[in-house]
Amino acid sequence: MMQPTPAPSSAPGSPQRTQAEPEMETPSYPQPPQNVGTAPFSVLVKLFEKLATERKQERRRKLLDAWFRHWRREKGFDLYPVLRLLLPQKDRDRAVYGLKEKNLAKTYIKLIPLGMRDPDAIRLLNWKKPTERDKSSGDFPQVLCEVVSKRSSVIEGTLTIDELNEILDDIAKNMGKSDVQSKILRRIYNNSTADEQRWIIRIILKDMNISVKETTVFAVFHPDAQDLYNTCSDLKKVAWELWDPSRRLNAKDKEIQIFHAFAPMLCKRPTRKIEETVKAMGGSKFIIEEKLDGERMQLHKRGNEYFYCSRKGKDYTYLYGKHIGAGSLTPFIDSAFDSRIDDIILDGEMLVWDPVSERNLPFGTLKTAALDRSKKENNPRPCFKVFDLLYLNGMSLLDKTVKFRKNNLRHCIKPIPGRIEFVEEYQGETANDIRKRMEQVMENRGEGLVIKHPKAKYILNGRNTDWIKVKPEYMDNMGETVDVLVVAGNYGSGKRGGGVSTLICAVMDDRRPDSDDEPKYSSFVRIGTGLSFADYVWVRSKPWKVWDPKNPPEFLQTAKKGQEDKGDVYLEPEDSFILKVKAAEITPSDQYHMGFTMRFPRALAIRDDLSIADCMTATEVFESLKSERKRKMEDDAGITTKKRKTTVKKVALLPEYSGPNLKKVAVKTDIFNGMKFVVFSDPKSRTGEADKKELMKTIHANGGTCSQIVNKNSEAIVIYGGSITPYDLKLVIDKGIHDVIKPSWITDSVTLGEPAPFKKKYFFHATEERKYADEYNEDDGEEEGAVPSADEQERDVKSGTVEPGSETEDEDEEQAPEIKEEQDGELHEWLKVDDRKSPALPAHDEEDSVTEDDSDNADVADEEEPDLDDWFQVKGETEDEGAGALATASRHRETTPDVDGDVKMGESEEAMDYDPDVIFKHLCFYLDSPANAQRHGMATRPKYEAAITKSFEEVEKLIKDNGGKIVDLDEPKLTHVVLDKRDDSRRVELMKRTSKPRRRHLVLSDYIEACIDEGTLLDEEEFAP
């Protein structure tokens, strides 16, 4: 058995070993199946175009499945040549081409050829520059296609898929050799059409824009493809290991392997309140780790060999060293490993440690430090911070708990300060434990915290509530920070013209039933500030589609009135991205489907590290509102100062939360005397609300009473006549207290003149207690043609007899129309979709395989469904008037304490948005000048006092010229504290003094100039002192 190499007795710079150096093993692949030929690249282009324009997700899956099936039938079972072109970003064999837009533009100008003053040459070189006339600006492949189409004489392309792969391999092999690459690209130019070249360039740039996620491609290719890719990050291995769709992997095949990059577990995005994070831990003690500002790294070691790779599978062994005689890290950490270790895999964060200042340096300095071969003791150096042990001596530890893995980790490694260390961790039990650690992190300019459940398993590529990150902005009441999905956009004008300049964002509507085919999104907010010019170039390169008011996107729910959430263009969810948005507060609005929007919203960052699955949900919006309302009530209860006398306006509820006026409905019988009912409308019915009101009138006319809410301890009978289970009804059913009866019971009771027996046929959902009642079991079952109950729907879905989301055959046919356009015979066969059967896909959505919660603590960590009864509370059981969410929000807005209260941001109560032309309007700044510091009893440094004073005079002018206000430290409307980097000694003191009632932004004075230069408000975190 190979033993680890002993620690070197001499310095790392001494002569290296003379024995043969171990070579990193090349991946082993199974023998690929043999194809009988290839296919024209043109048929793959047709698939790309179909996928890019098809609006229905299920239809895209069927198109992909039909294409794959035809390839297997006609060409063979080796789909690797196709997968490389569908998922170029996952192709490790062609990791880098060394060709970006600028190089491609110059190459094409030469090979077309174009004169340097030719308008099209200028257009290629300035493809990013937006203009009113050029709507394709920002999308280089499209610009190139338009330029080539004017000059290319190729009517029909002759390249095959195999030939294109050979060409791309040649380009990758000749990276850095522009002349050779230019000759190779000429083959593409001479043998493919302009449209085909557009897609080839997209493949080279690894930015396909085909509205299909990798998870969809993997799920259609093979049910186990995603799981296997998570363990190896190797597209070729997935293609050749799983070429047979009928062959399934066993559990061992899905385990991680030494020297194979895997997709690591990720943190779930921050919850709205720290208390929610604690609740997600299920009452258990939890582990608190500091979130580090480095690069996620996995370290593999077997004997003398080392392997380092990033979260996305990039090999960094060349930097850190594959043995003790190479690299900037391995020579210094080899002695840290216990001699009993044969092989091991660690998960951690690679940082830069500066031994002079004794602190970690910013992430941007990592590569410089890693490349430093000087080995000088005082130079910054890589330091690997380990937080997990995943593999040990041939055994995978993924199914072991965090606590088990951490305990064993400390027996495997002896830390070497500044080289390899453990992440600092603490035990927590309450929200205050987290706040205490967060205060320390903020004072030390840290990133945040990670909270881990001690019983959590390690889920490859998973993101669940076992690991939750907590960031400072989610605990300090600095306003609302959300992650929303960009769904539409409006074109700008003037200096913001030339493309999309305002983004319309939405949240995922999780109130809808789980059985819906595709997720729906509810419009929530529009953003017009916060993004830089470079951000807008990227945003405008997205595959925007024209918004048709008569046929709006099906996935997006918008307000019935108003134009605030209607765009000029829109993005399919698969092509879109998550935007981190910060605002002063969430406020009522009838201009968005949510019924709420954000006040003073601005973009903080494009979250390219998040997927659309990380989008905020409607329930989280309501929970945030409830939390904020509770906070305000607690603040109000603690205020002893006199409040201004105010009149609370009577606010009408939204229609869906209100009932009919029953005062004028006469009571005719006492059939339902003493009985209370809550009637739910059918969201799928156009007359749902009207039917609900008529049913309530019938109940009232026959002696019953109606309520708008289901109280926890109420004996109310719930009435519902729909075919699906709306989210609010699901919350009621999940409590297991209330039966859900069909409206037919009401009508039959009225016909009988007395309450009808509670037979099974009348139930949409029956409680466990009800199912044992004699009356319930008198009936044999549902009548012919009746709507299945919620329980039966759930059984059918689980057993596979009904596909989740399906309703009727007619609707299925509507949702998957035939391909009507004419195609030649051969091409038609490639895209022929059999609408009678779905692709052979897993029963769950493709995202489930990477996020399924199979942890030991699943039974305790599941968060209880939020109780939203408060949002539907009305004053009288049979009256229209009440106090719902809108009323509550309005009351808090109108009742304002004189002092120490919750002060609204903005120059007026009515102001809602920033002014893009006067960027600091509505903001208030305190300048930490020497004079102001002394006036507030804080010490100053005299060395730069004069220069700092002069600098702040210039900053003050810039702020005022751009609409901002200069205020004192105790101004309630204070938003920003500005410091000078030459003297930030008062940072912690200013942080403490301005933390109530909510924290303010502390920024360096550079922030002011940077915002003015970009013409927008930037993220304050980038300028924190």
UniProtKB/Swiss-Prot annotation:
EC numbers for this chain: 6.5.1.1
Enzyme class: ligase
Keywords: ATP-binding, DNA damage, DNA recombination, DNA repair, Ligase, Magnesium, Metal-binding, Nucleotide-binding, Nucleus, Repeat
Positions bound to Mg(2+) 2: 447
One of the GO biological process terms: DNA recombination
Chain positions covered by the region annotation Disordered: 1-36, 773-904
Protein name per UniProt: DNA ligase 4
Native species: Coprinopsis cinerea
Phylogenetic placement of the source organism: Eukaryota, Fungi, Dikarya, Basidiomycota, Agaricomycotina
